[in-house]
């Protein structure tokens, strides 16, 4: 289908055309019609670009070029005709460096729902040019990779793009729009001499104004001695090409004591190795260098290998290899119990876990035969602790630093007299040592079975605490003291001790009147089931109680009397390390229980008492409990936004019960706010069928009600004055009357209304007015009844908006379309009157509207500075006459016309004429397109004036031809959907065309070039249902005419594979033979088995032609103990339609044992062997017994294998031997 589209450049007045044209094939009639699909769109750009440099190309999904075209130079419009359905790729091919999004579009043309059939635009948007540049090494033609390069607008700091350089130093930015930019280079380690440059992008790709320069690269290495890093080794840098000025971050002063050996090298600078043995030169330009190590100790200069190393810096950082090594004394030390402390005797000092020495009485020790390096030294002494130190030993360090004790043992004992009964006795406990220094962490150890423990502690102040398990703590096990403070100085602490503790709990009960019988309970909070009770009794208002022998822990002490109020009905206490006293229970009143469906306020007073007994309670939903200070009968009244079943309730303290209040309705409020005082009516509809619709109104605004109240008050005061005047006499009436004024009514105006709703009721509130519009028009609210609904409805009313306009000059019948901004469909459509005027309203004033106009034959544009006024212009037209070179009309030509926002793609009819009317004045670009033809002019820009009608003649010349044919099955049935192709041969091998047969099996291959030979054949893809074609291809040679009757017969795929075979063997073995079929990946389970019986031939049921690998194996029941035979097997692949297999089975019978008489031939040798064995029987008999035993085992194994061989043996052969394929 070809979709023609049009849109006027000055507005929507131009009629949009959408046509579907069925066009017979050009040339001889072949009884089929070709559906032409136009795929078009725009190359779009917000900046000026040369559209003529851009090509749009259509490829098949396999990469064959189907069509190419250029763009309209005025607006970038393009159109590509398609003559076949299928999958294609549309590509934009701009000049190198230009960027577009997207670059390719995949098309699936089905003639129904694809973008081309629907007439949609395929647009390519220009995103920018490319900017190229280089980062070079100083003095070099190339540069490094990995430099970060950023692009930003000149004068700003924000980065637009970032990239990194490629090998050689090149970099590029893409999608850069015209403007002035700054390019900056950065690198985390390299120094840059020129770190920024500029570039100006106009209407093409641009190059950076100058290259960016890297001043140098960091070079590093390392030095070690016996595997340990060496500090303080100097590395001197020399070069014959690089100057000192080019080297950065390096000490250029001479090195004392160094004598150069090579006068050809120029000294540049030196660096010194660090703690970790590493050294580095911060910035060295590209070039050749020599580094020489130099190391002098306090008393000696050491050799360093290698003594000299040459290296070259290219365009990257360099790690110098190999590692430098310093090549090759007694040292003494002391072990002390603290800084400036005493020596520790008999301490064992270990060097690198190998050399061990003991300290003398003064704590000193001596290490001999030490080479330069870093060592680990560790000292050991009972109850003293030392840290392992790592120290660097060199000739200039003969005296080691003192080894100071860092910690001492802190030991103690836990004594438990009686274990609680509710837990199992434990033998071990965790003990925590915590320092007074908050920055230090806790140390935890575990006691032994006797309760002893020890810590390792540094000098300082500490406290020790036993961690009693939670179960034991709940059971009441407590130790004293809770913490043991101590101070560690320079010796171990061995006297820490903890012992067990018990306690008592006592208290008092105070009553408002006589206490009577009360029960006090003590219940452990941490030990379930441990509960003790005391029964108290007395006719006094105060009593005491005591619980003895209480284990430490948390307890709950409770007093039992449900109908009384207590200051504390229960108390939680914790027995730690002291006795517990001063526990008190005090009665405060009498309990009232109230069950509420909602949170409300209750007002109550006591019958027969004064106002001082009235109380107010704010209660929550659910069961509430509160206390009444005196007994009696109370009247309870609910106050809330809810209506209850009763207006008030009564409660008697002498008959305690639960007071239940259930709400049945809930107060809903609403407000309507308007900017004008108008008639407002509210309709409330309920979701409950039994509730009728409620109409409220006309409502009075709050301002009106306030005014009426003021008027009523003024009138009352006036009447009061008149009354007073009549009483006071005539002189009072001579005074002037008092004038009172009411407030003027000013908006906004509020209209309040309310409604009592049931729980779960859904109400719909709809306001109405003659001149107001409401926002929203109606509101719904669901009253859950869980809480006060409050103001659920808020609606605003506003005066309507009217839109008016005029057409200049006056023009009747112009269609005016009013739409809400962003809406897909128009809101209101009207036509101008005989004066060219219109008026629309009322409309919602808080919305934005768009006003458009259109009239056939006119372009209407909005008048600047007005809202809704338009100017009208008469339209122009263009007529195209397209002829063949024989001057005959040429139908079926796709003509694309575009200009501004207008575009149209139409096919010529039998007369070859196309007319475009209703065109706005301006420039247009046209391009005729038809496969197998070229046109003169091929494309052209034309200027159309207002009201002008142009006539343009176009001539088409035939450049290629078509091949027509059919594809059918052997019985003549047409084959639909077969993919065909024409493949060029010899010099035309780069050309090719493809198509698909229609429902009649017909096909047309277009665009075949004269003088070329093609093979017309089935495509390799898309024909999975076809097995083969007859012939495989047809050879055609294209002249100056179309080619007809290229017919091909195809055979559909058959998915069956037949397998048969025969066995060559003697007929006597046939009853013992089976033929088995296996899949090659599973030789354990046959998928089919066939018995031969009395026939030498066999046939398996049909297999699937699935390309799988199979194995056919012959199996026999002949006993291996009597026959020798090989079971043949053949492997094959299920390809094709049939397979015949021949198997050969030729068993041989085993020979019987030989007669004894034949033994006479070996009698003499056997006699000699017996005599020899007699002389050596002591050695030979054990050997013969062992040999006989082995031979019997081998024979038994062989017999078992022979008797049980058969199918399993054949399977093993099939797995181990390589199969024979046929």
From Swiss-Prot:
GO biological process, alphabetically ordered: multi-pass transmembrane protein insertion into ER membrane
Signal peptide: 1-31
Keywords for this protein: Endoplasmic reticulum, Glycoprotein, Membrane, Phosphoprotein, Signal, Transmembrane, Transmembrane helix
InterPro entries documented for this protein: Carb-bd-like_fold, CarboxyPept-like_regulatory, Ig-like_fold, NOMO-like_N, NOMO1-3_2nd, NOMO1-like_9th, NOMO_12th, NOMO_3rd
Tissue specificity remark: Expressed in colon tumor tissue and in adjacent normal colonic mucosa.
GO cellular component term, pick one: multi-pass translocon complex
Residues bearing glycans: 50, 218, 618
Family matches, as Pfam families: CarboxypepD_reg, Ig_NOMO, NOMO1-like_1st, NOMO1-like_2nd, NOMO1-like_9th, NOMO_12th, NOMO_3rd, NOMO_5th
TM annotation in the entry: 1156-1176
Residues on Extracellular side: 32-1155
Highest taxon of source: Eukaryota
Positions of region (Disordered): 1198-1222
Cytoplasmic topological segments: 1177-1222
Compartment(s): Endoplasmic reticulum membrane
Composition bias type Basic residues, residue spans: 1213-1222
In-chain residues carrying the UniProt-annotated modification Phosphoserine: 1205
An example Gene Ontology molecular-function term: ribosome binding
Bilayer topology term: Single-pass type I membrane protein
Reported function: Component of the multi-pass translocon (MPT) complex that mediates insertion of multi-pass membrane proteins into the lipid bilayer of membranes. The MPT complex takes over after the SEC61 complex: following membrane insertion of the first few transmembrane segments of proteins by the SEC61 complex, the MPT complex occludes the lateral gate of the SEC61 complex to promote insertion of subsequent transmembrane regions.
Subunit structure, interactors included: Component of the back of Sec61 (BOS) complex, composed of NCLN/Nicalin, NOMO (NOMO1, NOMO2 or NOMO3) and TMEM147. The BOS complex is part of the multi-pass translocon (MPT) complex, composed of three subcomplexes, the GEL complex (composed of RAB5IF/OPTI and TMCO1), the BOS complex (composed of NCLN/Nicalin, NOMO and TMEM147) and the PAT complex (composed of WDR83OS/Asterix and CCDC47). The MPT complex associates with the SEC61 complex. Due to the strong similarity between NOMO1, NOMO2 and NOMO3, similar interaction pattern probably occur for the three gene copies.
Name this polypeptide is given: BOS complex subunit NOMO1
Higher taxonomy: Eukaryota, Metazoa, Chordata, Craniata, Vertebrata
